[in-house]
Amino acid sequence: VFIADNIKEVIPEFLMVLKGVIDCPDLPLNVSRSALQNDGFVTKVADYISKKVADKLNGMFKTDRENYEKYWDDISPFIKFGCLKDEKFGEKVKDSMLFKNLDHKYLTLEDCIKANGGETAEETKAEETTDSEETKETPKTNIFYVTNEQQQSQYINMFKEQGQDAVILAHNIDSAFITYLEQKHD
């Protein structure tokens, strides 16, 4: 029995671009907004869909990164919006997030940190275990970014002259996403 399409409570808002059919005998036939909002099973279905999308993205990133990079510019606004809306989704896809640098190569956040002289999470954990008796302040890593390559070309040239790298953040959602990353990694 066809119940409805575009049920916002079943498909997370950031995944509304997905097309498909959900065959679920346990969904209630009464699809009023209040019935769906109060149904714990509907929440489980939405969480499961988010998890499966995150798993698929991670799988593509690990097994077919070249193809993943081809689609990244198209899917990144939705993934970044998903990270802002759903913390569990953000945690699952954090290692598959890519940032385009000034050479138009795609880097992960860990790669960006390494490229700018910072320490990765593994290096920081290893250092914490070896220096457990000393209290040591961790140096902050600056990652520079540009939002418009033409308008900010003088900064890009300056970065290149100094041997610095920066990431290109051209989507509208990137300003909110960068704020999210700064809060998450402080």
Task: Locate each region found by the language model.
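Conserved GHKL (Bergerat-fold) ATPase module
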Residues: V1-D186
